[in-house]
Amino acid sequence: MSSEPPPPYPGGPTAPLLEEKSGAPPTPGRSSPAVMQPPPGMPLPPADIGPPPYEPPGHPMPQPGFIPPHMSADGTYMPPGFYPPPGPHPPMGYYPPGPYTPGPYPGPGGHTATVLVPSGAATTVTVLQGEIFEGAPVQTVCPHCQQAITTKISYEIGLMNFVLGFFCCFMGCDLGCCLIPCLINDFKDVTHTCPSCKAYIYTYKRLC
């Protein structure tokens, strides 16, 4: 007989220690998945990165600010073929007043006169109505010196003075009484002149 001891039994007390030390033995017919390790020096990718969002074919992602045709501006859903109701309309025959634009009209009691100057340009002057070259001075623009002036007036004997004198003679007045109408300024013609350049502007006749 040989004096060598028999080999240890595989299921003996040392078997669990070998399994814990070297890991579970590989199962025959199955291979462990290969794990890709990054090359040395490169950081590991974060573990929370998931797959890209799923996009159905033929429907791209909408751009920021794009409103689908079936959605309103406030985000409410509108079924196809639905149109928002129109806003309130004014009653039939009513038209809202538009903005008022004042036109170039003179104020009440005013009158627009056009005075020609020697250069050929037209100057528009607004004077008081009822005092346009009559028996009182008038504010206007001199057509000669082109300055804003108040006309200077002078009285001259005109046709109305002679008519009133002949009327007095016809009524049997004395020779001296028929000269009285020639002394009253209210019966004389009025001549308007420029106080600056002394130029003649207009003559107002009591009787044409």
Swiss-Prot record:
Domain of life: Eukaryota
Tissue specificity note: Highly expressed in brain. Expressed at lower level in heart, skeletal muscle, kidney, pancreas and liver. Weakly or not expressed in placenta and lung.
Primary localization: membrane
GO molecular function per UniProt: zinc ion binding
Location of region: Membrane-binding amphipathic helix: 164-184
Keywords attached to this entry: Apoptosis, Endosome, Lysosome, Membrane, Metal-binding, Zinc
UniProt function note: Acts as an important p53/TP53-apoptotic effector. Regulates TNF-alpha-mediated apoptosis in a p53/TP53-dependent manner.
Free-text note on domains in this protein's UniProt record: The LITAF domain is stabilized by a bound zinc ion. The LITAF domain contains an amphipathic helix that mediates interaction with lipid membranes.
Entry's family note: Belongs to the CDIP1/LITAF family.
Protein's recorded name: Cell death-inducing p53-target protein 1
Organism name: Homo sapiens
High-level lineage: Eukaryota, Metazoa, Chordata, Craniata, Vertebrata
